[in-house]
Regions:
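Signature of multi-pass transmembrane helix bundles
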Residues: 105-251, 416-437
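Flexible, glycine/charged-enriched surface loops at secondary-structure junctions
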Residues: 40-44, 84-89, 110-112, 188-194, ...
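A structural-propensity feature for long, helix-poor, extended segments
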Residues: 42-86, 98-109, 286-336, 340, ...
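N-terminal signal-anchor module of multipass membrane proteins
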Residues: 2-37, 41
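A structural signal for small-residue-enriched, beta-sheet-centric alpha/beta enzyme cores
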Residues: 3, 17-21, 51-52, 137-141, ...
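Conserved phosphate/anionic-ligand binding catalytic regions in large, soluble enzymes, centered on
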Residues: 16-32, 254-271, 313-317
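Membrane-embedded translocation segments of transport machinery
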Residues: 227-231, 235, 248-281
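Alpha-helical support elements that line or immediately flank enzyme active sites
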Residues: 23-39, 266-283, 323-331
Length: 437
């Protein structure tokens, strides 16, 4: 992979998103399908993999008073603005909200959970005259199929099964090679990395000025002035990531910069690293480079653990990337960066994902705190040895082990979590899907 490849990959994976990306994905698919039809909507049929449903069923939608994937699909069908991508929810108005609520109230929005291992969202929007259909696969905005009635408008399904060339190149790299590539980049090429800091900082500022969520961030902020937590780098990072996540999960009307398809991953990476860079008085160039490194490493880990899995990606992928980045910002060696990754694997691998919701703020705070501890241990020559559990001799082998723990290791965990969360009418369907796997 060369510099141009890295910039291109980062521009694919580090993008703005308004709202939790799972309901946004459902809305985007419905918007694309609805754009192909006219007239009054008589049915909206949504199909999605269990992980997508799990992550979107309990999270707030910005500018909207209801939660759930039915409402997300209805909003998309009314908006029809699929070309806005992951920011399509910016188009919500009171009249759009009323129309979406009315569609769900008519009981014409239906969801089917389907046996797809990776991210999958299919939408069919029906009117009296036409039937529009869309399929999103692989990542939250990757529309691979569109049809109007029997006429195929777009079909990229054959190419959607695997990674593209850029991701294949990243997959084959070592952590050290990702570090070297980021170190050689120019600020003019990586300046867009700072856009994510500004965007996510705006969400944190919004939370500081408004009553948002259930008080997680406010309490952490207050605790920094007390005797138990104190005001230090670890507590400030915990507060920053928690405030952004709590705001985003409860419908803050601002977009965040995502990473590897997840807004909370982007929050973890950008806010934790920005706070650390401020603490060490890093230059803008150093900040740009370390953000590029961490975003690339986050994608690298997610390619092993899965886009939507039983593991909390914010803790397992994003916060592990933060641990490596904190070592990076202190001038640590490649070996110490690798050791921070191994320490994180020993620490919080197995943290479950039980869907997108306000409680994610707690997990982001916990994982970020673990990142600070893991980096501090690594900088002082402490690493969990390869004979301990899933830890291996190299960060690459350890990351591969994390992936194996996720899939197939935690498939049954995902089954249990999803069946605990979904409405009773979906339980047997979900169990049968996981049995087939």
């Amino acid at each position: 992979m060369n510099q141009a490849d890295m910039i291109m990959l980062l521009k694919q994976e580090v993008v703005p998103a308004l709202g939790c990306t799972e309901p946004v994905c459902a809305a985007l698919g419905a918007a694309a399908a609805a754009s192909l039809v006219d007239g009054d909507i008589t049915a909206i049929n949504l199909k999605m993999n269990p992980g997508l449903y799990k992550n979107g069923m309990a999270v707030s939608i910005p500018g909207f008073s209801r939660v759930g994937m039915k409402y997300a699909g209805a909003l998309g069908a009314v908006l029809r603005n699929y070309k806005a991508g992951l920011q399509l929810l910016e188009g919500i108005t009171p009249s759009i909200s009323e129309a979406a609520i009315a569609l769900v109230g008519k009981d014409i929005v239906h969801i089917e959970i389907v046996n797809e291992e990776n991210l999958y969202a299919e939408a069919e929007v029906v009117t009296k005259s036409h039937r529009g259909r869309s399929i999103i696969r692989g990542n939250h905005s990757n529309i691979v199929f569109l049809s109007q009635d029997d006429k195929i408008v777009l079909d990229k399904r054959a190419a959607a099964g695997g990674n593209d060339l850029l991701h294949d190149k990243l997959y084959a790299m070592t952590v050290g090679e990702i570090y070297d590539l980021s170190q050689s980049a120019d600020e003019k090429d990586l300046g867009f990395m700072l856009d994510g800091v500004k965007m996510n900082q705006a969400v944190s500022d919004y939370v500081a000025q408004h009553q948002v969520g259930i008080g997680i961030a406010k309490t952490l902020e207050k605790s920094m002035g007390g005797k138990i937590m104190g005001d230090n780098l670890a507590s400030r990072i915990m507060y920053k990531v928690a405030s952004c996540a709590e705001g985003r999960m409860t419908g803050c009307p601002f977009p965040v910069m995502s990473s590897a398809g997840s807004g909370n991953h982007g929050i973890t990476v950008t806010m934790a690293i920005f706070e650390t860079a401020m603490y060490f008085h890093s230059t803008d160039l150093e900040l740009c480079r370390v953000l590029a490194f961490a975003h690339m490493l986050n994608v690298y880990i997610k390619m092993r653990t899965g886009k939507l899995s039983a593991m909390c990606g914010c803790g397992i992928a994003a916060a592990t990337s933060v641990a490596a980045a904190i070592v990076y910002l202190q001038g640590g060696s490649k070996e110490q960066i690798g050791n921070a990754i191994i320490n994180m694997a020993a620490n919080i691998t197995g943290m479950i994902c039980d869907g997108g919701k306000v409680g994610c703020a707690l997990k982001l705070a916990t994982a970020s705190n673990a990142a600070v501890m893991s980096s501090e241990l690594a900088m002082n020559g402490v690493v969990i040895p390869a004979s301990n559990g899933i830890c291996a001799a190299t960060p690459e082998e350890t990351i591969a082990n994390m992936g194996t723990v996720s899939k197939p290791g935690m498939t049954e965990t995902d089954t249990t979590v999803v069946t605990l969360e979904v409405p009773i009418e979906y339980v047997d369907e979900v169990r049968s899907i996981y049995r087939e796997k």
